[in-house]
Every structure is written in C-alpha cells, then in structure tokens.
C-alpha cells in the first residue's frame, strides 16, 4: 500500500493511505485526517504536486 510523507509541526511523518479517513483541498494543498490508533485522529497536509496518486483519487471519490 502507498504511504504519504509530510511534515507536521516540524516533524517528518509518514502514514499509510489505508489509515486516511477524510481528504479535502485547501488552495494548492491536500489536507487529510488519519487514524493514529488508540482512538486518536491525526492531521496532515501535503502539496498537490507531492501528493501520491492514491491520495488524489481519494479526493476525487469524496467529491462525488
């Protein structure tokens, strides 16, 4: 499965696409929430040009 690499609060993070719950666009950035485990929800964002195609496909599916 694909992963998304991003920085959040100065920390490099990586999350598996399968853990992503919600995806939305903010300007040229793709923002998302994901399951961190233990009942916690994490947030992240990646530029549109750096986003993996699977994340962009999730965004298109949610628009419909």
Curated annotation (Swiss-Prot):
Superkingdom assignment: Archaea
This protein's record includes keyword Cell inner membrane: no
Modification note: Lys-5 and Lys-7 were found to be 60% monomethylated. ADP-ribosylated by endogenous proteins in vitro.
Pfam family, one: 7kD_DNA_binding
Keyword Lyase: no
UniProt keyword annotations, A-Z: ADP-ribosylation, DNA-binding, Endonuclease, Hydrolase, Methylation, Nuclease
Stored InterPro entries: Chromo-like_dom_sf, DNA-bd_7a-e_arc
Known EC number: 3.1.27.-
Molecular function via GO: DNA binding; RNA endonuclease activity
Modified residues (N6-methyllysine): 5, 7
SUPFAM superfamilies the UniProt entry points to: Chromo domain-like
Function, in words: Can constrain negative DNA supercoils. May be involved in maintaining the integrity of the genome at high temperature. Has RNA endonuclease activity with a narrow substrate specificity; the cleavage products are 3'-phosphooligonucleotides.
NCBIfam families from the UniProt entry: Sul7d (NF045555)
Subunit structure: Homodimer.
Family note: Belongs to the 7 kDa DNA-binding/endoribonuclease P2 family.
Protein name, per record: DNA-binding protein 7a
Gene name for this UniProt entry: sso7a1
């Amino acid at each position: 499965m694909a992963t998304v690499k991003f920085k959040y609060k100065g920390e490099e993070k990586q999350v598996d696409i399968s853990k992503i719950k919600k995806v939305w666009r903010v300007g040229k950035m793709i923002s998302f929430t994901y399951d961190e485990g233990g009942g916690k929800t994490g947030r992240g964002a990646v530029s549109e040009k750096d986003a993996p195609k699977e994340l962009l496909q999730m965004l298109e599916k949610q628009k419909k």
